[in-house]
Amino acid sequence: MSYQEKNAMSPIIDALVPMVVEQTSRGERSYDIYSRLLKERVIFLTGQVEDHMANLVVAQLLFLESENPDKDIFLYINSPGGSVTAGMSIYDTMQFIKPNVSTVCMGQACSMGAFLLAGGAPGKRYVLPNSRVMIHQPLGGFQGQASDIQIHAQEILTIKQKLNNLLAEHTGQPLEVIERDTDRDNFMSADQAVEYGIVDAVLSHRGE
């Protein structure tokens, strides 16, 4: 995950999105596949974590809470990580809203993606069997006067400590273990992620 004061919005690639057609009492109604799954309280967090994507995820979380504050939300994650500030806006919203947010890793949850995966509701955090999880310390760079660099260096250390404390809380690992294991890129298999406490179970089949 990266710490940056200014994050350039990653380019949004227009792609062909499948449409779903439903029969209603008023005739046919078509949805794009993501809107249809949103009706089932499913949100996708895919690709780089950045401000635009984070705003979309936060908006969907708030909308689903307004629709039904007592029903679980399912957040599917396939992300290499990204901006700390964007990721924390998603994390704080997950903790703020009333519904439990169940997290599911498909493909990969690295860096901020892994942090959000661990931040799901206790007992409702899952990983698919061939996915990978990676944790590490925040990354960042800054140019400017020596005094400004010192300020930003202190800020990234503060963020590192905050993230480590939260990860320790969600995984049940001692803080010193988290500090050691996030010092460098630390990749885990699905089973290792369960053992570490980032997720609660490996899902191999729908019925589990």
Curated annotation (Swiss-Prot):
Q: Where is the active site?
A: S111, H136
What InterPro entries does this protein map onto? ClpP, ClpP/crotonase-like_dom_sf, ClpP/TepA, ClpP_His_AS, ClpP_Ser_AS
Q: What is its EC number?
A: 3.4.21.92
What family, per the record? Answer: Belongs to the peptidase S14 family.
Highest taxon, organism lineage: Bacteria
A Pfam family the protein falls into: CLP_protease
Cell division recorded as keyword: no
Q: What GO MF terms are annotated?
A: ATP-dependent peptidase activity; ATPase binding; serine-type endopeptidase activity
Entry's HAMAP family? ClpP
Catalytic EC class: hydrolase
Q: Which reaction does it catalyse?
A: Hydrolysis of proteins to small peptides in the presence of ATP and magnesium. alpha-casein is the usual test substrate. In the absence of ATP, only oligopeptides shorter than five residues are hydrolyzed (such as succinyl-Leu-Tyr-|-NHMec, and Leu-Tyr-Leu-|-Tyr-Trp, in which cleavage of the -Tyr-|-Leu- and -Tyr-|-Trp bonds also occurs)
Q: Which GO terms describe its biological process?
A: protein quality control for misfolded or incompletely synthesized proteins
What protein am I looking at?
A: ATP-dependent Clp protease proteolytic subunit
Gene name linked to the record: clpP
Q: Which SUPFAM superfamilies match?
A: ClpP/crotonase
Does Repressor show up as a keyword for this record?
no
Tell me which Gene3D superfamilies the record gives: 2-enoyl-CoA Hydratase, Chain A, domain 1
Listed GO CC annotations: cytoplasm; endopeptidase Clp complex
The subcellular localization recorded is: Cytoplasm
Q: How does it assemble?
A: Fourteen ClpP subunits assemble into 2 heptameric rings which stack back to back to give a disk-like structure with a central cavity, resembling the structure of eukaryotic proteasomes.
Q: Which residues form the signal peptide?
A: none
Return the PANTHER family for the record.
ATP-DEPENDENT CLP PROTEASE PROTEOLYTIC SUBUNIT
